Amino acid sequence: MAAVASGQLTQNPLQKVWVPLSLHRLRRRGSTVPQFTNCPTMVILVGLRRPGKTYISRKLTRYLNWIGMPTRVFNVGQYRREAVQSYKNYEFFRHDNEEAMQIRRQCALAALQDVRTYLSSEEGQVAVFDATNTTRERRALIMQFARENGYKVLFVESICDDPAIIEENIKQVKLSSPDYKGCTPEEAVADFLQRIECYKATYEPLDEQLDSGLSYIKIFDVGVRYLANRVQGHVQSRTVYYLMNTHVTPRAIYLSRHGESQLNLKGRIGGDAGLSTRGRQYAQALAEFIRSQSIRELKVWTSHMKRTIETAEALGVPYEQWKALNEIDAGVCEEMTYEEIQERYPEEFALRDQDKYRYRYPKGESYEDLVQRLEPVIMELERQENVLVICHQAVMRCLLAYFLDKSSEELPYLRCPLHTVLKLTPVAYGCEVESIFLNVEAVNTHRERPQNVDISRPPAEALVTVPEHY
């Protein structure tokens, strides 16, 4: 191969390849997409159809996708519903029902084939295999599949014997299952309890001696106690750490941006300005709203910036400042209007529109950087009960994307208006959102992606979606 003169090539930060310098400037500019794994990982759920298993699989998938690890859930129950169109009763799950056992095995094998496609052909990094997997035989089958394909494996066993937790889970989750469509609550509960008894007949829990060579975490009573064994590698470590920081205690998380700031009025991004007159009015309205909610043991978090601190001061309660909650760093574009950015840095303005999530401001941050900065905040939010987070537009988008399972493409364009509280209530398989406008007008700071994102676009087409400002 002929030698290439120094300076003729540069490294493309998104694709991690060397490209001609002249072409590089026409490509998107951003932070590298993180590659957390040297080989794909399978997370295998284990346990009776009791609380925690599907809850864990969906919650874990949401978290791993949010931090940049492409992850997908493979729910074997869904494969079974597609194979058997009409569910009759628990008899299908009896261990002596040979025909049904064969169908269930074929469904598991079909799911494993889809896992292979996802991890080996679609650039997935983690597959969460959501099934009971209660027998040592089934787990051995999965381990053989993983070895043949070069995947790492982490088992996650959910064990729950608390009657109160089991009853609440049945009430929240199982009665809404497609299996029980058209059934009365009493019929659904009775059948589901019989189904659990069917699984109990062949259930072989992970054993500390027999399974000492496996990587696993056992979760008792949805987080009361944990037992981890041979946790290896980055993905497994982060997975276990995350699972040990979650709980199912009923709670509410309130997200609010600061009150309108002086720089918001002028259409300038970033900076550390104080509140406008209307911003101070919002701070008072927020205080009245929080008092009216009578929230038990509410914690209040802010960033280190004036506008969030001034908003929190009106509450008259202690608050905790997080530097991690500071607004995205716009680097050389701090305190500029969009019009000024287009005039001085038209190429940067276009590059950001091309890939807003990964684009990094010169000497500043990208949304991808911000997600990594906010991970400790998410961990602490998962540990807490009722929390009010007073933050900033980009920060609120990142937090909201985590709780609502939004993609990196959707995240930078989530609407987070000023003077509006979002109340998030975690439920069985997701999060309910209530938007509460507190009747104090404010400027609009939301800018949609323009249709034309080409570097050579006219200024008018670059600025067409810029909101009005003074």
UniProtKB/Swiss-Prot annotation:
Catalyzed chemical reaction(s): beta-D-fructose 2,6-bisphosphate + H2O = beta-D-fructose 6-phosphate + phosphate; beta-D-fructose 6-phosphate + ATP = beta-D-fructose 2,6-bisphosphate + ADP + H(+)
Amino-acid positions noted as binding beta-D-fructose 2,6-bisphosphate in the UniProt annotation, renumbered to this chain: 257, 264, 270, 338, 352, 356, 367, 393, 397
Residue span of region 6-phosphofructo-2-kinase: 1-249
EC number: 2.7.1.105, 3.1.3.46
Catalytic residues identified in the record: 130, 160, 258 (tele-phosphohistidine intermediate), 327 (proton donor/acceptor)
Tissue specificity comment: Liver.
Database matches in InterPro entries: 6Pfruct_kin, 6Phosfructo_kin, His_Pase_superF_clade-1, His_PPase_superfam, P-loop_NTPase, PG/BPGM_mutase_AS
Pfam family, one: His_Phos_1
Residues where ATP binds: 47-55, 169-174, 349-352, 393-397, 429
Activity regulation text: Phosphorylation results in inhibition of the kinase activity.
A Gene Ontology term for the protein's cellular component: cytosol
Residue ranges of the region described as Fructose-2,6-bisphosphatase: 250-469
MF annotations from Gene Ontology: 6-phosphofructo-2-kinase activity; ATP binding; fructose-2,6-bisphosphate 2-phosphatase activity
Modification sites for Phosphoserine: 31
Segments traversing the membrane: none
Superkingdom of origin organism: Eukaryota
Site (Transition state stabilizer): 257, 264, 392
Gene Ontology BP terms: fructose 2,6-bisphosphate metabolic process; fructose metabolic process
Residues given in the record as beta-D-fructose 6-phosphate binding sites: 80, 104, 132, 138, 174, 195, 199
Description of how the protein assembles with itself and partners: Homodimer.
Membership in a protein family: In the C-terminal section; belongs to the phosphoglycerate mutase family.
Entry protein name: 6-phosphofructo-2-kinase/fructose-2,6-bisphosphatase
The organism of origin for this protein: Gallus gallus
